[in-house]
Curated annotation (Swiss-Prot):
Residues 1-23 form the signal peptide. Chemotactic factor that attracts monocytes and eosinophils, but not neutrophils. Augments monocyte anti-tumor activity. Also induces the release of gelatinase B. This protein can bind heparin. Binds to CCR1, CCR2 and CCR3. CDD domains: Chemokine_CC. Pfam families: IL8. GO terms for molecular function: CCR chemokine receptor binding; CCR1 chemokine receptor binding; CCR2 chemokine receptor binding; chemokine activity; heparin binding. The lineage of its organism: Eukaryota, Metazoa, Chordata, Craniata, Vertebrata. InterPro entries: Chemokine_b/g/d (IPR039809), Chemokine_CC_CS (IPR000827), Chemokine_IL8-like_dom (IPR001811), Interleukin_8-like_sf (IPR036048). It is found in: Secreted. O-glycosylated. This is C-C motif chemokine 7. The modification Pyrrolidone carboxylic acid is found at Q24.
Amino acid sequence: MKASAALLCLLLTAAAFSPQGLAQPVGINTSTTCCYRFINKKIPKQRLESYRRTTSSHCPREAVIFKTKLDKEICADPTQKWVQDFMKHLDKKTQTPKL
């Protein structure tokens, strides 16, 4: 039993100091943020500020991450029509010059 506990401690210590253990966690570097769940309902357009797509090979699925005016990030399914419409809306909004 003591040998098993010692082996477990050794393995955990080795894992903690391995290159993978020292890598940044998913979500700290914006280029590797992954979405594991998508919002089920539409977000009011007026609350949205911007969006970005996640296409990292480290992520299980492609996603669109909407950023709200309150600085929240919301994951959405890019295959949903409303998500595509909102992306087009935000694209037009950013292309329109402000006077």
